[in-house]
Amino acid sequence: MVESSRWYSVPETLSAKAGLPIVSLPFNNQIQTSPFSVRSSYYLPLQTVNMSPSLVAPRQKALSLRHPTMAGKEYLEEFSKKYIIDVLDVPNREEWLKQLPKKVAKDGPYSALIIGMGTGPYEPFDAEFCQALLPDLKLVVSASAGYNEFDVSWMTENNIWFCNTVDAVSEATADMAIFLTLAALRDTTNAERSARAGNWKAGFVPCRDPTGLRLGIIGMGAIGKHIARKAAVFNLEIVYHNRKRLQEADETTYKATYCPTLASLLETSDIVSISVPLNDETTGMISESEIALMKDSSILINTARGAVVDEAALIEALESGKIWRAGLDVFCNEPDINPYFKTSDKVVVQPHLGGLTAVAFRKAYRECFENVASFFDTGKPLAPVNDVTRAKGTPTASLP
């Protein structure tokens, strides 16, 4: 008897006739757990049951890099009734490249690949990373909003759909932007260090209030809209710059005024908050020339990607006082960030935690699975970044 870790659902009518409960059973074999099966956490080997291959139809299969437990046990159980999810749980890229061919040979092929959170040890997601899954791989989904570590052009050229998460981490990231804004305004980095050192309010002067200040949002996608909605509570005046202007109704909803150029936003904003994806167009978007346009003693908030901002130019502006404070959740060369940001009292620092909440993670993983389900059912995911039905090699997503 050959063991298998593939799971199939016994039809209800067959289970009823046999007097058995309706459970998920392995194909033509006895029940077993597998280190590569997401279901191994949820099913126990209660009895040995033999099934004929003719009684069940094969289901489409997805491979997940590490266990997608954040999606929730009940959700995964429900998803697994219709589709097969296998897991390859390895610590780094080297092990992935070593183990993937064996996994595909044993349990493949796989037409979908699920990439969860915490991707640093595995990046980049390119031809080498996916090679052993070809030619069957047709979809890659990521639980992250940003996708600069994914070679989307290569995927498009190879007729592979790519999906990031559209809205899962948006509100959590917006919360981080608001937190950094308030922390910068209230100079909490200095305040906390002083309090921990036992210097209670020593040398402190009144901080800045948000009321009446102008907040300029660069990138009015899902994150930018959440920022605008939340910022209005603090009586901030909202302006925004976007590749495409919002509908008038949306501008009314978010109480946001459109700036037709980036320069017009920078010149008039007291606080500049960045929420754009990282791509060729946005890399270095805020450099020395853009910072020169900003109001004196302004505040810069970045929850997008580190490379959107020229860090050397930012440091120079902080030291000169051109920029009064910065609130940063993202950096170049993470986690080895510039030592200046670790020590400067002029910077509020967070270790890229914007989307790291339990609710955001659950939503992100489920959004991945919904894209997989849509692809398995219809041949197209719900929210692709690229379009493999159009000209190859050109991702369709740019600025929001």
UniProtKB/Swiss-Prot annotation:
Q: Does the keyword Isomerase apply?
A: no
Q: Which GO terms describe its cellular component?
A: cytosol
* Top-rank lineage group of the source organism: Eukaryota
Class in the EC hierarchy, top level: oxidoreductase
Q: In which pathway does it act?
A: Secondary metabolite biosynthesis; terpenoid biosynthesis
Q: What is its EC number?
A: 1.-.-.-
Record keywords, A-Z: NAD, Oxidoreductase
| Catalytic center residues | 305, 334, 352
Q: Which SUPFAM superfamilies match?
A: Formate/glycerate dehydrogenase catalytic domain-like, NAD(P)-binding Rossmann-fold domains
Chain sites annotated for binding NAD(+):
222-223, 303-305, 329, 352-355
Q: Which InterPro entries match?
A: D-isomer_2-hydroxyacid_DH, D-isomer_2_OHA_DH_cat_dom, D-isomer_DH_CS, D-isomer_DH_CS1, D-isomer_DH_NAD-bd, NAD(P)-bd_dom_sf
Q: Which family does it belong to?
A: Belongs to the D-isomer specific 2-hydroxyacid dehydrogenase family.
Role this protein plays: Dehydrogenase; part of the gene cluster that mediates the biosynthesis of enfumafungin, a glycosylated fernene-type triterpenoid with potent antifungal activity, mediated by its interaction with beta-1,3-glucan synthase and the fungal cell wall. The pathway begins with the terpene cyclase-glycosyl transferase fusion protein that most likely uses 2,3-oxidosqualene as substrate and catalyzes glycosylation immediately after cyclization.
Protein's recorded name: Dehydrogenase efuE
Q: From what organism does this protein derive? A: Hormonema carpetanum
